[in-house]
Design a protein with these regions (language model features):
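Formylglycine-dependent sulfatase
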Residues: 1-195
């Protein structure tokens, strides 16, 4: 869901220091293809196929194996935390657990409240009780659950951990301290960023 220009390392105006450090010490892409929608991009990423092959009828093409299915068959532990948005809510056969992930925390829907996300699941079970806890924020919950999955993973088995944040996606719900940090930044409009 994040665009290339959203990251500080590619010229974005929002501070992304941790991602910038990863980019500084890792591999940065300079030639890439992006689809105009988050769902088809996600389907292509998880199947390694062109989006018109990977995504059919609001779900991953059943004839395409996901990265999780392939890696699980090769002996990897497979975990996911975050936004799925590759199936309709009633199509459980297309949910993360059914598409190769052994453990999952996140939303089936693509966009929802960051404070009370619709379709929140832990594996295939409803997890809406999670956001009844004071201070719940979906972005933090995605990170916390991913960290917990990594911490309890077997050290002698390779791990595929897929994390899909909703934070750069509509609706844009930020914590008050994050809003305050950028107060006035866009008071003159977006055109000042293009200058």
């Amino acid at each position: 869901d994040m665009g290339l220009s959203d990251l500080g390392c590619y010229g974005g105006e929002i501070a992304t220091p941790n991602l910038d450090r990863l980019a500084q010490n890792g591999l940065r892409f300079t030639r890439l293809y992006n689809n105009n929608m988050c769902t088809v991009t996600r389907a292509a990423l998880l199947t390694g196929t062109y989006h018109t092959i990977a995504f059919r009828n609001q779900a991953i093409n059943p004839r395409c194996a996901t990265l999780a299915e392939t890696l699980h068959a090769a002996g990897y532990a497979t975990r996911m935390s975050g936004k799925w948005h590759l199936a309709n809510i009633g199509e459980r056969n297309q949910w993360p657990i059914q598409r190769g992930f052994e453990e999952y925390y996140g939303t089936i829907y693509g966009a929802s409240s960051f404070f009370a996300p619709a379709s929140l699941k832990r594996n295939n079970a409803d997890a809406s009780k999670d956001f009844e806890k004071p201070g719940y924020y979906y972005t933090d919950a995605i990170s916390d659950n991913a960290a917990a999955m990594i911490a309890k993973a077997h050290k002698d088995k390779p791990l595929f951990m897929y994390v899909a944040y909703t934070s750069p996606h509509w609706p844009l719900h930020a914590l008050e301290e994050d809003v305050a940090k950028y107060k006035g930044k866009y008071a003159k409009g977006w055109d000042t960023l293009r200058a």
